[in-house]
């Protein structure tokens, strides 16, 4: 038996099983606390489909299909894919459209054939808006995509607490509402989604995106207010807005149910001046005891610069991440 886990440890754990199983769900699964993990860090690498945003196209209207994306990732030696909802045929930015079961299951079967996991999925939403009807619509959209995630076998769905309206902020779209009031809107909506996710075995991950959630404290406060064992943090390494973004990652890491690993820590515009120190990042991940997928995502600047070629850049970044994983093992 593994030297780090003795027979005595096993028997102690087994003795507690009847007690744990008899507890109410709220006691057995502590809400709003750091994720309880056992064993050492176990890390696998996934590819977020957003890396191929232009090629996939919103609603799957680009020249690259999700199946072809999965095949590329298998050839590149990823462990999994993270097929963002935007790129499925049937996706609607503000509507309730979802892909057909036939399409979902074809992608799932192909990933199985390729030995790829499906590490998660995600959609866009705006819970900071003062428009209550729009927020309610987004709750229903997330519920629809929770069902999609369950059919895919994706354990996590990413949602946002930040506004996704370009050139806007949470202050502007909330019409000047107080932060505590906006946090309550967000928490109530995500809690409803998490309760729905519990019925399908899908965890809701709240991703920091540099607006309402600028720091780990912002993220943790919201997760605690949501207070659900079916909700945790998606730690986006490129979207904290603080003086020490690595410190923010370290603080949020114990709450992580998934990650988004970017090439820079201060946004795509500052990648050259603030590239991600992958060794430092992996030490943070390992120190937290995280076990699971590290989805990577490459971004191209909007505007004048030439877009990155994901066919070239994604495998290069994957190799760098794998080297950092090996170097910190």
Give the role of each language-model region.
Residues 79-80, 117, 155, 203, ...:
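Residue-level detector of anion-binding/catalytic polar loops
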Residues 85, 125, 161, 263, ...:
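Residues that line or immediately flank small-molecule/substrate-binding pockets and catalytic motifs
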Residues 63-65, 97-104, 139-142, 187, ...:
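Charged helix-capping and loop-helix junction motifs
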Residues 82, 120-122, 158, 260, ...:
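Conserved beta-strand positions in the central sheet of alpha/beta enzyme cores
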Residues 82-106, 164-167:
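Glycine-rich, proline-tolerant flexible connector loops at the mouths of alpha/beta enzymes
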Residues 2-46, 51-79, 213-329:
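Histidine-acidic metal/acid-base catalytic patches
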Residues 14-24, 31-37, 71, 104-120, ...:
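Active-site acidic/histidine proton-transfer and metal-coordination neighborhood
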Residues 94-97, 126-135, 265-267:
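The substrate-binding groove and active-site-proximal loops of carbohydrate-active enzymes
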């Amino acid at each position: 038996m593994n030297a780090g886990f003795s027979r005595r440890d096993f028997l102690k754990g087994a003795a507690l099983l009847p007690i744990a199983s008899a507890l109410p769900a709220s006691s057995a699964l502590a809400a709003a606390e750091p994720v309880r993990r056992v064993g050492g860090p176990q890390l696998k690498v996934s590819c977020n489909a957003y890396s191929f945003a232009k090629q996939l196209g919103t609603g799957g209207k680009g020249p690259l299909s999700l199946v072809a994306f999965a095949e590329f990732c298998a050839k590149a030696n990823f462990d999994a894919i993270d097929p963002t909802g935007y790129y499925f045929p049937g996706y609607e930015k503000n509507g309730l459209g979802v892909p057909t079961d036939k399409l979902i299951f074809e992608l799932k079967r192909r990933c199985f054939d390729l030995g790829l996991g499906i590490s998660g999925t995600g959609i866009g939403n705006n819970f900071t808006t003062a428009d209550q009807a729009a927020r309610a619509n987004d709750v229903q959209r997330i519920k629809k995509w929770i069902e999609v995630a369950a059919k895919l076998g994706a354990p996590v769905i990413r949602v946002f607490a930040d506004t996704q309206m370009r050139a806007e902020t949470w202050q502007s779209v909330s019409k000047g509402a107080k932060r505590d009031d906006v946090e309550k809107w967000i928490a109530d909506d995500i809690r409803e989604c998490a309760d729905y996710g519990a019925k399908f075995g899908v965890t809701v991950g709240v991703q920091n995106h540099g607006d309402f959630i600028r720091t780990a404290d912002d993220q943790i406060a919201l997760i605690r207010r949501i207070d659900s064992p079916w909700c945790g943090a998606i730690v986006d390494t490129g979207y904290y807005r603080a003086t020490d973004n690595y410190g923010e990652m370290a603080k949020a890491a114990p709450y992580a149910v998934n990650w988004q690993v970017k090439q820079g820590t201060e946004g795509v515009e500052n990648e050259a001046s603030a590239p991600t120190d992958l060794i430092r990042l992996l030490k943070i991940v390992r120190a937290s005891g995280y076990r699971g997928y590290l989805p990577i995502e490459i971004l191209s600047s909007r505007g004048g610069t030439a877009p990155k070629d994901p066919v070239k850049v994604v495998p290069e970044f994957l190799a760098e991440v794998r080297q950092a994983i090996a170097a910190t093992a």
